[in-house]
């Protein structure tokens, strides 16, 4: 899968205004799980909550576990730390069992109080569905701009939606005149995916969505405090 692009920015006096100090900043690199949450915030936010309310009140504990990376680590403390690095908060994460769907009778991961870890449930029926979030995510293509302030920075990307299919290729699209099935269409038209997207971008970059990420420095981390689509 594609994740939010990582890029190193060197900004003179960007944050340390005294003494001409230069700071090297790494734009946070989000995985598929986080990028899925951002898509759902834009397109599955039925109560039209703002970003802060959405991540704290608009998603379930089960979905918070998913975004925290339960499919990558079994330690509850690590899951809390992952959320802290992304949002500057644990989002009041609770050590409950993890279910793919709320209606499931069996959890995929069972929480073990004695070890403070999650154990995979061998009795669960195998499924390709990992969460009840929509199986689509944000695909950032190119950085449009970076704006600095005293507390952090704002990054705007040109990007697309990516629709994931567990039994087929992922489709990146603007829901209009750009549509590409990654790793599949190239066998039909002979073009690489990179070439197709670069041609579409060069033809009219405004055909791409604009995704804006607002970061604030909290301790040593740059945490996401807002996300918008222009």
What name fits each language-model region?
Residues 1-230:
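Mature, Sec-exported extracytoplasmic domains of Gram-positive
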């Amino acid at each position: 899968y594609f994740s939010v692009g990582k890029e190193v920015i060197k900004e003179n006096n960007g944050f340390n205004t005294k003494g001409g100090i230069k700071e090297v900043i790494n734009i946070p690199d989000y995985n598929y799980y986080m990028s899925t949450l951002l898509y759902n915030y834009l397109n599955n936010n039925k109560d039209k909550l703002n970003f802060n309310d959405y991540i704290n009140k608009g998603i379930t504990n089960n979905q918070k576990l998913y975004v925290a990376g339960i499919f990558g680590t079994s330690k509850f403390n690590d899951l809390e730390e992952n959320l802290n690095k992304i949002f500057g908060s644990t989002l009041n994460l609770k050590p409950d069992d993890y279910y793919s769907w709320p209606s499931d009778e069996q959890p995929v991961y069972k929480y073990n109080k004695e070890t403070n870890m999650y154990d995979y449930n061998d009795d669960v029926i195998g499924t390709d569905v990992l969460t009840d979030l929509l199986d689509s995510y944000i695909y950032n293509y190119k950085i449009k701009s970076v704006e600095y302030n005293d507390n952090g920075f704002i990054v705007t990307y040109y990007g697309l939606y990516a629709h994931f299919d567990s039994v087929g290729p992922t489709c990146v699209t603007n829901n209009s005149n750009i549509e590409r099935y990654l790793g599949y269409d190239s066998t039909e038209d002979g073009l690489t995916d990179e070439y197709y997207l670069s041609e579409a971008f060069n033809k009219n970059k405004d055909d791409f969505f604009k995704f804006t990420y607002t970061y604030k420095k909290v301790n040593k981390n740059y945490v996401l405090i807002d996300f918008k689509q222009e």
